[in-house]
Swiss-Prot record:
The keyword Transit peptide does not apply. S-adenosyl-L-methionine binds at Q225, F254, N259, E275, D302, D324. PANTHER family: 23S RRNA (URACIL(1939)-C(5))-METHYLTRANSFERASE RLMD, RNA M5U METHYLTRANSFERASE. This is 23S rRNA (uracil(1939)-C(5))-methyltransferase RlmD. PROSITE patterns: SAM_MT_RNA_M5U (PS51687), TRAM (PS50926), TRMA_2 (PS01231). InterPro entries: 23S_rRNA_MeTrfase_RlmD, MeTrfase_TrmA_CS, NA-bd_OB-fold, SAM-dependent_MTases_sf, TRAM_dom, U5_MeTrfase_fam.
Amino acid sequence: MKTVTVKIETLSHDGRGVGRLNGKAIFVEEAVPGDVAEIRITGRQPSYEEAKIVRLIDSSEDRVEAFCPHYETCGGCQLQHLSIDAQRKWKASHFYTALSKAVNMKACQIEAPLVGHDHAYRRRARLVLGKNKTDKEARFGFRAKGSNEIVDIEQCPLLTPALNEALNQKRTAVLPHASRALKEISVVDADNGIFWSDQAVDSSTWPSYGVNGLTLNFPAQGFVQVNAEMNEQMVNKALDWLDLNKEQRVLDLFCGVGNFTLPIAQQVKEVVGIEGETDLVQMAQHNASRAHCEQATFYQADLFKDVTPQNWFRKQKYDRVLLDPGRQGAYQLCKGLGQLKADKIVYVSCNASTLIRDVKELEKQGYQLKKAIMVDMFPHTSHTEVMAQLIKTGKKPKQRGPGIFKL
C-alpha cells in the first residue's frame, strides 16, 4: 500500500498524533508533535484519515523509548512514547484550550498541574483471564489495543510492587482454569492487604485506604482512586479551594465512601454526603462513625433524577458544594444547584468534556469560573482528572476570554 510523508503538528484528544495532508487531518498512532514520518493510511473517513507509522524520518525531541515490553500490544497505556513532561503539558493545554472555547475565563486562574510519581502508582487493576481466539493459549493480563484479545502480563511497571507480586501468584492459580469465556478479575492494593474480586470479604476484613490521616473502608469490588498519591493531593486542593471554616454547611455530591466528605467534616460545622449506591452510603456512614465525624451525615439518592423534593435539598442553604460525578457528569443536577445559593462550588471530574458542559450550565445560574487545574492521576495514559472552582456572582455570563495561565 502506498505511503506518504507527514509532519505531526499536535495531539488529538485520545493522544494520537495529528498531521495534515491535502487539507485533511490525519490521526497517526504513536506519533509525537515534531515527528516527520512516513505513514500508511489504515482508515478513511469523510473529514479525516487514520494511519500508522512505517518509518520515522525525523524524531521529535519529546519522543522517548517506551519502558514496557508490552506497550505495542497492551491497551492499558497510550503515551509511553511521549516524555512525561510533554504528556503533562499536552493534558493541561488540551483541557485549558477546550475550557477557554466554551466558558468565560477572564477571571479564571489556571493553576500549575498536580503531579506525582509516574511509575508504580496504580493500586487497582482490572485483569482478564481466558484463552485467545487465535492461538488458544491461556492468558492472564490486560486487553490488547483495539481488540478483546488478552496480552499475557507477568509484570506491569505502573502497578505497585505489591500488586505485581500478587499478580504473579494469582497467575499460577487461575491459568489452569482459563476458557474461551473471558473472565474479568479486579484487584486492589489496599492499606490492609491485597483484595481480589473473586474472593469473599466480610465486614471484619473490608479493604481500607488512608487520606488526610483518616482510614476509609471501601467495598472490595467498589471504586477507589487508582493513584493514592494524587488522590491525597486532589483532596487537599479541594479543601483549599472550598476555603472552609467551622461555621459552614457543605454538600458533597457523588460522595462515595466519604473520600472528600470526611476530610471536609474535620473543618466545618456540618457536611452532607449524597451517593446513589446504597452499599456506598452504608460504608460512608461506617467510616464516619469509625472516625468519630459527627459533623457528617449521608443519604442515598439517585442524582440523575430530580432531587429538588428531597429533604436534604429542599429549602436548604449550603455555603459550599463539592461534586465528583462519574464520566457522564451531572448536567441535570447542575441545572438546580443555583437554588442552594452556595458561595463556592468545586467540581472534580475524570472527564473534562462533561465538566466543561456542566460549568457552562452553572454560568447560567450566576456562577463564575475562578480556578481550574489538571490532575495527572493516570500518567502514560490519555486519561486525566480535572478540577474547577466557581463562585456565586449572580451575574449572567459574559463573553469568553483567556484565563490567567500558570503552566
